[in-house]
């Protein structure tokens, strides 16, 4: 086992990486409220795992979506638990994100030289809310359908381009299969990918610049 470790150590300098990770200075003013960002990340990872599990059974069509969700809840082993965890962690992620934003703002964590960290954080906040909007429609029940109809109809009030934006969001003039397909793609592929990339950038900048000092 030691020879295997030495082989990797010689090529990757594992010990140096571990030392760099574990020896980072933590300011004495840091308290439990500085963990809110990490809790948000944990909720995101739970979302990815539970959401991936549900993709094995969910069917993104207007005729089968609701029935497939019911199947997950009543027939799949622990399906009710997986979906419930997904919903609970979604609510927790939004709450932790909001508290994290307030904590950073109130402690001045957005000030120079951490402006870009703040910008990526704000974008991540928008993506988090977008997860909620797109995921809400996927069961394709009455609540989800009318929520999508209202949300996608909001841009229509924008002069000149409003109607085009509505059609872009819905995939057609009215809410239907194209809308569900778009929201499913956004919820399961586009948004998770963007969130993962921005989270990586966010944490690398925090790692580089360190935690902001007390006010």
UniProtKB/Swiss-Prot annotation:
A GO BP entry: respiratory electron transport chain
Keyword hit for rRNA-binding: no
Subcellular location: Plastid, Chloroplast thylakoid membrane
Major localisation: plastid
Domain of life, per lineage: Eukaryota
MF annotations from Gene Ontology: electron transporter, transferring electrons within cytochrome b6/f complex of photosystem II activity; metal ion binding; oxidoreductase activity
Topological type in the membrane: Multi-pass membrane protein
InterPro entries: Cyt_b/b6_N, Cyt_B6_PetB, Cytb/b6-like_sf, Cytochrome_b_N_euk/bac, Di-haem_cyt_TM
Cofactors required: heme b; heme c
Keywords tagged on the record: Chloroplast, Electron transport, Heme, Iron, Membrane, Metal-binding, Photosynthesis, Plastid, Thylakoid, Transmembrane, Transmembrane helix, Transport
Amino-acid positions noted as binding heme b 2 in the UniProt annotation, renumbered to this chain: 86, 187
Cofactor binding comment, as recorded: Binds 2 heme b groups non-covalently with two histidine residues as axial ligands. Binds one heme group covalently by a single cysteine link with no axial amino acid ligand. This heme was named heme ci.
PROSITE patterns cross-referenced by the UniProt entry: CYTB_NTER (PS51002)
Gene3D superfamilies per the UniProt record, alphabetical: Cytochrome Bc1 Complex, Chain C
Residues noted as binding heme c in the record, renumbered to the chain: 35
Note: Heme 1 (or BH or b566) is high-potential and absorbs at about 566 nm, and heme 2 (or BL or b562) is low-potential and absorbs at about 562 nm.
Xref: PANTHER family: CYTOCHROME B
UniProt function note: Component of the cytochrome b6-f complex, which mediates electron transfer between photosystem II (PSII) and photosystem I (PSI), cyclic electron flow around PSI, and state transitions.
Protein family: Belongs to the cytochrome b family. PetB subfamily.
Protein name listed in UniProt: Cytochrome b6
Organism per entry: Anthoceros angustus
Gene it is expressed from: petB
């Amino acid at each position: 086992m030691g020879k295997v470790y030495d082989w990797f150590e010689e090529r990757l300098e594992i010990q140096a990486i571990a030392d760099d990770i574990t020896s980072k200075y933590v300011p004495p003013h840091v308290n439990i409220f500085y963990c809110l960002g990490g809790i948000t990340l944990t909720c995101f990872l739970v979302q990815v795992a539970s959401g991936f599990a549900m993709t094995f059974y969910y069917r993104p069509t207007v005729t089968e979506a609701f029935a497939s969700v019911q199947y997950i809840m009543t027939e799949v082993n622990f399906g009710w638990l997986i979906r419930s965890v997904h919903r609970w962690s979604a609510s927790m992620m939004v709450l932790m994100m909001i508290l994290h934003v307030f904590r950073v703002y109130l402690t001045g964590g957005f000030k120079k030289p951490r402006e870009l960290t703040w910008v990526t954080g704000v974008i991540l906040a928008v993506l988090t809310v977008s997860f909620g909007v797109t995921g809400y429609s996927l069961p394709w029940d009455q609540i989800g359908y009318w929520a999508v109809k209202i949300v996608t109809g909001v841009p229509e009030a924008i002069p000149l381009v409003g109607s085009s934006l509505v059609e872009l969001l819905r995939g057609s003039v009215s809410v239907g299969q194209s809308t569900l397909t778009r929201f499913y793609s956004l919820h399961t592929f586009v948004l998770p990918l963007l969130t993962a990339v921005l989270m990586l950038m966010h944490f690398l900048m925090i790692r580089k610049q360190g935690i902001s000092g007390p006010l």
